[in-house]
Every structure is written in structure tokens, then in C-alpha cells.
Amino acid sequence: MPEEITEAVTAVREALPDANIGIHTHNDSGFAVANTIAAVKAGARQVQGTINGIGERCGNANLITLIPVLMLKYGCETGVAKEKLHRLKSLSRMLDNRINRLPNAHAPYVGDAAFAHKGGLHASAAIRDPRTYEHIPPETVGNSREYVVSDQSGKANFIARFDELGIAVDKDDPHLDTLIAEVKDCLLYTSDAAD
């Protein structure tokens, strides 16, 4: 657990102040990235991890998550140039493709859902100011913002999707409400829970 890692790294640093401490974590409890961050904050200077966290048992610290966290959230030097962070998503996808594995749509930073806005109010706020729901600009890590049309969508989602297609639609167009109702009705029948 992160607090145990902090205690252990702190103890080693006190006993061996000149040592270059490293950390190698596994994700058996889902804490590989958090434990690695705790170690770095406590003084570890060498981090071991893998692309997409692939490793034995439940995997290792995911460098695709860890690198932007350390650089963008903690201001750490990682050896990766900031102007190359935009290659993280393509690197993640390349490995998944090579090992014939579907990408994790919910992966932090690089997953397709990481910057997807599904709910109507959520999308409306994100359109006005993406910082309301996005912790970084998605382009920083090679990702992109998406406004999803779903059963939770409002006008903002639909208008954003039309804009992407080059179609101008006024938010007060009465046909828009009809379209939204029909799409939501159709989506009800595509759910796994539908009878």
C-alpha cells in the first residue's frame, strides 16, 4: 500500500542517504502506479514499469499512466521530453496491436473514454470550458476530446457531433428535440438490459 511504500523508502533513505533507490511494483492490489508515485515522493529516483502495465500476474506499474502523472502532476523529470508526450497513445496502441489485444478504452490518459463526454450537462460544460471536466488537454498525450451520443446526451452532445460533421444546427431547432427523443428511444433497445 502507498503508505507502506512511503515508510519503507523513507527508512532506506535514512539508512543509506547516498543510495540511488529504485522501485519495481506489481499491480496485484491495483496500486502499482500509486505505490510507485509514493516511492518517488519519498525519494526513489529509479522507476521500473512496463508499457500498458503488462507483466506477470496482474501486471506492473503502467508507464503510459505513470509518465504523465509524474511529469504533469508532480513536475518530475522522467527522461521523456515533454514535447514527446503526445506519442503516448500511439505507443500504447502499437503495443496492444502487436500482442493482438484490444486497447483498454478506460485507460487513464490514453483510453478512448478518457476525454469522452457523455452526459448532457457534462458535455455542455466541457464545450464552454474543457477544464471543467478535463485534467489536461487531451492532445498533450496524443488523445482527443469526444462528445458521445448516448441515452444520457443532451443538445450539446448532438450539436457537437453535428459540428464535427460540418453540419450547422441551431440549439432551438424543434427538429433537434425530436431527433434526440428518437435516438434515445432507439438506444433503449440496444441495451443489454432491454427485453
Please give the residue ranges for each predicted region.
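Hydrophobic faces of well-ordered beta-strands that scaffold small-molecule active sites
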Residues: 21-25, 47-49
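Glycine-rich phosphate-binding active-site loops on the catalytic face of alpha/beta enzymes
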Residues: 45-59
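Catalytic cores of alpha/beta
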Residues: 31-42
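Mobile "lid/hinge" segments at catalytic clefts and subdomain interfaces of large enzymes
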Residues: 54, 60-73, 113-167
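Terminal amphipathic helices with adjacent charged low-complexity linkers/tails
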Residues: 171-188
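Conserved small/polar residues in nucleotide/adenosyl-binding loops
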Residues: 189-195
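Alpha-helix-loop-beta-strand connector modules within alpha/beta enzyme cores
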Residues: 7-21
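Phosphate/diphosphate-binding loops
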Residues: 77-112
